Amino acid sequence: IGVSNFKPAHLEALAAETDTVPAVNQIQLTPAIPRHEQRAYNLTHGIVTESWSPIKGILDEPVIVDLAEKLGRTPAQIVLRWHIQRGRVAIPKSVTPARIAQNLDVFDFELDASAIAKIDALEIAGGAGRVGPHPAEVNG
């Protein structure tokens, strides 16, 4: 099964009550909100971490815009490539055919170590920028 927004406590309760470990845990994950602890937990337990809203709130960051201009790419392509090179599953939402095509056109270039480090540095302490409800506050 797949779950969304499950923190370690939720995953442990699920396993204890159903003897089930999900295959995928979909969480908000961007360069600004990297969710280190959650990803580490998922990895340790064989759960794939999938990012929802993988590009939200980050496309106007000067670092992203600068890299996009230097590499002849869109800011979204830069962020999606960062996810790929970090070994993350990122599924951006779009209904625009041109944007969908751009989002898929990220496999013919790479970000160098310096670019990755600059994007990593966009992390916001404490996960500020979260959108949507906190999982601990949904259904008790």
For each predicted feature, which ranges?
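Beta/alpha (TIM)-barrel catalytic core signal, keyed to glycine-rich beta->alpha loops juxtaposed to Asp/Glu
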Residues: G2-G140
